[in-house]
């Protein structure tokens, strides 16, 4: 985290000073959130894990419910609608969905440890959960969160004992779905191009990549 904050400061201080006359404004803002995040992590770690097991399906249902709300009342930014803004707080429901996937997967696996080699308990419930979340994220659209959650689900299934034959099939299916996503969402092609050739659009799509390169170079 410390290294990330230092890299952020190195990449943002010039632009921050140009816009706000305070070179550390972006750094300080992120530092505050980092400290708050550590506090939340500590509080969560103090909660008995049995509580998460009992509330796992409720957490998952709440996260899916929030994702359903995004297309209707979400805040649009950069051509995508990913945030919910309730005035006193704004957040991306996809972050809660990640937590919901972890809790629900762990609870199901703990209850059916001996049946993880079967389709019914080793594949079906997880594919249904990931499928619902992936479709809702597709509507936003939110490619990065989709990939993270799918990868997270795959890792949990692997650790949980899902048969490798099913895992290979899911990887193939996942690659096909990602290909379809890239073909149907035009903005992703622009982002890939900006990643490969950031100098072609240094003030917009290529800005973050170039600033990261400046940070590494300095």
Predicted regions and their residues:
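N-terminal signal-anchor transmembrane alpha helix
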Residues: 1-7, 176
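Short glycine-rich loop/turn motifs that provide flexible caps or phosphate-binding loops at active sites
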Residues: 3, 36, 73, 160, ...
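Hydrophobic alpha-helical segments of polytopic membrane proteins
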Residues: 57-60, 64, 120-136, 143-183
